[in-house]
């Protein structure tokens, strides 16, 4: 009779799905209201003018316009704004 010794168990073999975080629309790009600008965990980027903040800290455009990234304030925070075109 052919025999094969039992293989040992392993504790590996798991991994979580990637969450596809990051900047989705870059500076200078034209966007429509509702477009997602940044997906993030926490406020790595802050909401500037014409930008909303979702409950999962997603930044989205509130108006049509052009994306602008800037640093402001005493803490030099990064803000994402949408400048509307008149």
UniProtKB/Swiss-Prot annotation:
GO terms for biological process: translation. Keywords: Ribonucleoprotein, Ribosomal protein. SUPFAM superfamilies: Ribosomal L27 protein-like. One of its GO terms (cellular component) is cytosolic large ribosomal subunit. Signal peptide: none annotated. Pfam families: Ribosomal_L27. The keyword Acyltransferase does not apply. Residues 1-23 are annotated as: Disordered. The keyword Cell membrane does not apply. GO terms for molecular function: structural constituent of ribosome. HAMAP family: Ribosomal_bL27. Belongs to the bacterial ribosomal protein bL27 family. This is Large ribosomal subunit protein bL27. The gene is rpmA.
């Amino acid at each position: 009779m052919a025999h094969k010794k039992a293989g040992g168990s392993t504790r590996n073999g798991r991994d979580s799905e990637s969450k596809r975080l990051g900047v989705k629309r870059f500076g200078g790009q034209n966007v429509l209201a509702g477009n997602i600008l940044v997906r993030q965990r926490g406020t790595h980027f802050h909401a500037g003018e014409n930008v909303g903040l979702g409950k999962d800290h997603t930044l989205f455009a509130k108006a049509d316009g052009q994306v602008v990234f800037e640093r402001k304030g005493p803490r030099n925070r990064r803000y994402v704004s949408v400048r509307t075109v008149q």
